[in-house]
């Protein structure tokens, strides 16, 4: 399913004709340039590889420079892939723009969530706190029991505990497209999308729409 790579600009709001305020996230989608077309015969699957934005010449590695030169496209800030469905065809060097979403109502947005560092179980997993009084000493935000006794004699894998929070790939599904601004290469998406301002996001037509 083909999507677009964009950059999260921030949030604002737009008004409907009857004065209702809609909170929207602005995603800037510069032209996505096709840098490679993968086929079933040569790669074992059908997909296109795209790049967007720009990268300083001294930041482009030699293998990357050769790859972009072969495709005849300007070096971008990264490389992403979209699987192709039967009948979809693209040429190397062609460009994908926000107009791809002119007829799309709902999208899934994938980004990297904001990193929160090392956090306790209350913030990370929404555990309830223990009693503030009634004899409790120094265990107000402690997680409590983490298992049983001699049987099984271990802590089960996946046990919710304190640890590194955020900075992981997150997808928010079924977000509504409020406006497609082809002139300024902007997508206005209702609600919040994952990640910090300036982060890369992948916008695809919703799978559950």
Curated annotation (Swiss-Prot):
One of its GO terms (molecular function) is structural constituent of ribosome. Methylated by PrmB. GO terms for cellular component: cytosolic large ribosomal subunit. Signal peptide: none annotated. It comes from the Bacteria. Keywords: Methylation, Ribonucleoprotein, Ribosomal protein, RNA-binding, rRNA-binding. The modification N5-methylglutamine is found at residue 150. GO terms for biological process: translation. Belongs to the universal ribosomal protein uL3 family. One of the primary rRNA binding proteins, it binds directly near the 3'-end of the 23S rRNA, where it nucleates assembly of the 50S subunit. Part of the 50S ribosomal subunit. Forms a cluster with proteins L14 and L19. This is Large ribosomal subunit protein uL3. The gene is rplC.
């Amino acid at each position: 399913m083909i999507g677009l790579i964009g950059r999260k600009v921030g949030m604002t709001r737009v008004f409907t004709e009857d004065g209702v305020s809609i909170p929207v996230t602005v995603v800037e989608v510069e032209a996505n340039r096709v840098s490679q077309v993968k086929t079933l015969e040569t790669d074992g699957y059908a997909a296109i590889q795209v790049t967007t934005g720009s990268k300083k010449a001294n930041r482009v590695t030699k293998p990357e420079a050769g790859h972009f030169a072969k495709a005849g496209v300007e070096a971008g800030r990264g490389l992403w892939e979209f699987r192709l469905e039967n009948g979809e065809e693209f040429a190397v060097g062609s460009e994908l723009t926000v107009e791809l979403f002119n007829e799309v109502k709902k999208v899934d947005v994938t980004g990297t969530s904001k990193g929160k560092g090392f956090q306790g179980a209350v913030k990370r997993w929404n555990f309830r706190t223990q009693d503030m009084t009634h004899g409790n000493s120094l265990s107000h935000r402690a997680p409590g029991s983490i298992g049983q006794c001699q049987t099984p004699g271990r802590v089960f894998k996946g046990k919710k505990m304190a640890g590194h929070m955020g900075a992981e790939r997150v997808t928010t599904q079924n977000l509504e497209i409020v406006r497609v601004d082809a002139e300024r290469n902007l997508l206005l998406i209702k609600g919040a999308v994952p990640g910090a301002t300036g982060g890369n996001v992948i916008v695809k037509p919703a799978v559950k729409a």
